[in-house]
Amino acid sequence: MSQLKELPFATLQFYSTAPYPCSYLPGQQARSQVAAPGHLINAGAYSQLVEQGFRRSGLFTYRPHCDNCRACVPVRVDTARFAPNRSQRRAWRGHQGLRAFVAELAWSPEHYDLYTRYQQGRHPGGGMDDDSRTQYAQFLLTSRVNTRLVEFRDAEGTLAMVSIIDVLDDGLSSVYTFYDPAARGSLGTYNVLWQIEQCRTLDLPWLYLGYWIRDSRKMAYKSGFKPLQLYLDGAWQAPPPGTL
């Protein structure tokens, strides 16, 4: 276990996990660098950690720390300068009938049912398609930072999508989103656009989208939200030519 001097947390320590199978690149082994102890990571500390390329899963705050791979790149959208492309504008128009309801984290059988249908429909065999209620709650409903749950419902009140968002000092961090896998249109794209609009409303400059991987189809959508910054070599910067 070691302390990282470049991070401004005298009381936090950072350690590397043992290797485990990579969730995104088949055949690869991954490691994570974990910030601990978790109870010291409040909203302010977490905002600074996100600026250093970290994100969280439940109470687990981490960033990639693989031995021979740097494929996972933290990315964030410049919300003030963002301009949607044609397909994004179409997704935005196509879901204008949805209403968003922002709430505190709370258990809901309706949410869990939608989560289960989403995992089974979009990520079958991915390991999360049989998550128990406890696993779901630990993953999405457990937080020590400033987190919100957003419901999206249609005109009849039917739940179409749920998004979990962390509110940071300089932006929003998109934690996880799940939606009706049978729905038409690009609900995932609409969700990111909605979060960008929320950043603008709150005068927050950045929307953090987690990690982008060039060779992962699951991550490809993130490169479409421009201008995008990448966290490379310890600093946020514009994508080098040919990166995206």
UniProtKB/Swiss-Prot annotation:
Intracellular or extracellular location(s): Cytoplasm
Superkingdom to which the source organism belongs: Bacteria
EC number(s) on file: 2.3.2.29
GO BP annotations listed: ubiquitin-dependent protein catabolic process via the N-end rule pathway
Uppermost EC category: transferase
Pfam families linked to this entry: ATE_C, ATE_N
Catalytic function, reaction form: N-terminal L-glutamyl-[protein] + L-leucyl-tRNA(Leu) = N-terminal L-leucyl-L-glutamyl-[protein] + tRNA(Leu) + H(+); N-terminal L-aspartyl-[protein] + L-leucyl-tRNA(Leu) = N-terminal L-leucyl-L-aspartyl-[protein] + tRNA(Leu) + H(+)
Keywords from the named record: Acyltransferase, Cytoplasm, Transferase
Segments traversing the membrane: none
Gene Ontology MF, one: leucyl-tRNA--protein transferase activity
InterPro entries the UniProt entry points to: Acyl_CoA_acyltransferase, Asp_Glu_LeuTrfase, N-end_Aminoacyl_Trfase, N-end_Aminoacyl_Trfase_C, N-end_Aminoacyl_Trfase_N
One term under GO cellular component: cytoplasm
Signal sequence coordinates: none
Protein family: Belongs to the R-transferase family. Bpt subfamily.
Described purpose of this protein according to its UniProt entry: Functions in the N-end rule pathway of protein degradation where it conjugates Leu from its aminoacyl-tRNA to the N-termini of proteins containing an N-terminal aspartate or glutamate.
The protein's name in its UniProt record: Aspartate/glutamate leucyltransferase
Native source organism of the sequence: Bordetella petrii (strain ATCC BAA-461 / DSM 12804 / CCUG 43448)
